[in-house]
């Protein structure tokens, strides 16, 4: 069985990274299902871990210097990199230390195939909304990317690019663990008087949830028979701006902020909401035209919840009846149209089961990574 080192510079000790953690663990499981023996590299705060089927190697660091030294090469003293035929790297803001790590790996094991996942490309637009420190890290990443071609064999991307940094790409899109994100059955009951929208995200500007709040403000200025409630679930840099917008429009009765939810609390939220709100602001980072595939859309599909998006997602057929597409611009969302969309889709017999079945057949990580596995095995 071929050995694969799955390398991610992600702190799984932070609760708010739960969504990304779920994705990475599902990818790891998919590679195992596809016949690889996977060793998983990650960290929890100051403890760096390499997890195999048989054991977990833990290395606790006491200083930032010691942490970086081990993260970007020190761990090679504790494993036999020569035993691995493949390495899968989840992209992060790289730096010259990472390039040195790749150099060290290739020097000790020239035959190893290294693939890096860069989901969205170009990704630089995402950092226009981040802190100065993050923007400086981006500059370091752009410098380091000049050396990717020397050590990285393929880029795995959800974009349409055939080459990234001069490296051939493998095109796929986001998948999901349909066992973990199971169907909500029965779906939330609709009494004809209330509709509940679910905005579940790591709150960032490109999710465009402000467009729903602006739409609710317009909607509530006219007397309506159906009350619409918007539930915000998650944390992130944009959350305070959304709260301020709610206060500005005096919508605290209709926009409910729940913070981070998981487990039974999240299941309950899904079972009481009718429509999922996907990403509505991808145009803000130049990623609305088939260049991305949001995890959240796949979760809504697996859960059996009709949803709204503002970008092209090639993971779904063009006339998929359970997606409501809105224009990718800054206009407020028309709440009346969402109500109509929900009434039409919820009238389809067993709509939630139909959505879940599509997810099981087309959106699993095993299906999405099969081509990656084949490329690893190509001689």
Regions picked out by a protein language model, each given a short descriptive name:
Residues 161, 175:
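Carbohydrate-associated surface elements
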Residues 1-46, 82:
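N-terminal subdomain of nucleotide-sugar transferases
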Residues 189-207, 213-216, 231:
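Conserved donor-binding/catalytic core segment of Leloir-type glycosyltransferases
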Residues 22, 26, 204-220, 240:
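A conserved mid-protein helix/loop that constitutes part of the nucleotide-sugar donor-binding site
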